[in-house]
Amino acid sequence: MKIFGEDGFRDLFKKGLLEEKFLNKFFSALDIFLKRQKVKKVFIGYDTRFSSKYLIHLIIKNLISIKLIYVGNKPLSTPCLYYSSKQRKSFSIMITASHFQKNFNGFKFFYRGRKLDKNYEKKILSLFKYVNKNKYKIKQIVKKVSLHENYLRFINERFNFNNINKKILVDFANGSTSVFKNKLNFLKNCNKINYLYNGHNINEKCGSNFLKKNINKKNFKKFNYCIAFDGDGDRALFSKQKYGIIESEKIAIIFLNYFKYHKGHSVYNVVSTKIVNPWLKEYLKNENNIRLYKTKVGDRNIINKQIKVKSILGFETSGHYSFYYAMDGIYAAGLFLEILKENPELIDKIINIPIAYKLKIFNFSSNCTKDIKRKLKLIKNKGNKIIVRKSIWEDTTRIYLFYKNSQIK
């Protein structure tokens, strides 16, 4: 059974990978791993799902070798916990299913300021056979603490402005970024929606999952720009009035141009995934002399490549943007609004650039992939590009068709 994806694991609450029996075994194995690594304290963050309380209790029950466990006193965004983990050089567990609906949950893991790497994941899985052999539990201290302060200070010092001469709508997806509603300086004068979380409304017809549909609603149309987060705040989508959702490739170009030509940073490359629009590589090379590196889909893959090639920016087409080697939707929102305030012409210029390839995404049951792929190869021979990717968490294979022929349906 596959457990880890590229960013922890998730499942339906109390089903599959989130069944109590499996989780007891997993966190007991994690406990052995942490003991061998001489980890003495663990930090736990969580988003706004109703199931978080149950999972916190289960984790604490099984980490019998950890002396100090700190639990956030309120929901926490994943970027916030990552920043806290990096500052404290600790082991941290984020309880979240990101953009998935309320009946899902899952876990992301951070160790020494980085996402848990594959070698550590393999070590944890290899320890399953030792579970239940050591029942000794040390005297444990569990504290509820605030884990927000350092991150909020970092963000507010970086984006120290609040007066933007545009009408901005921010959708918090009833997720963990909701707790920052009145604490982020750069959002002070923005209109805000979907922040009254109740444990059962995270990502419910709101946030980044539904921005494409919601921007057609009357209450969205009156704003110049909309920003939508997902449930744990590591992604952000942007839309402009009368344009629609701004493609992540164009957002990346906006960021890169701002860094290079307005902030004077050295920008030689950028990292994205294999499903990025093929147009981007040629555009960056010809217009900005910037090299595009591609890697497998997944936050960890992007960040590892970003570190390796020393890139100022990494991004996924889903709306994840990495600046300080972490995917951070809040930072992305702050940067976008900073550019909107200081150089709105740059945004207008970039979003009006024509994209050579259009994109269609086809979802199929995984057992149909071979037949579909064979048919799509006929289209590829006409100068189009095809990428086939199997979903980690669903029995679905996605086929990405990048095409120039407007006749394709």
Where are these regions (language model features)?
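An N-terminal, well-structured beta->alpha segment
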Residues: 1-66, 141-166
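Short glycine-rich phosphate-binding loop at a beta-alpha junction
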Residues: 39-47, 71, 167-170, 265-272, ...
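Phosphate-binding and adjacent anionic-ligand microenvironments
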Residues: 223, 263-409
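Gly/Ser/Thr-enriched, mixed-charge loops and adjacent short helices
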Residues: 3, 12, 105-221
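N-terminal small/polar loop signature for handling phosphorylated ligands or for N-terminal nucleophile
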Residues: 32, 41-104, 184-239
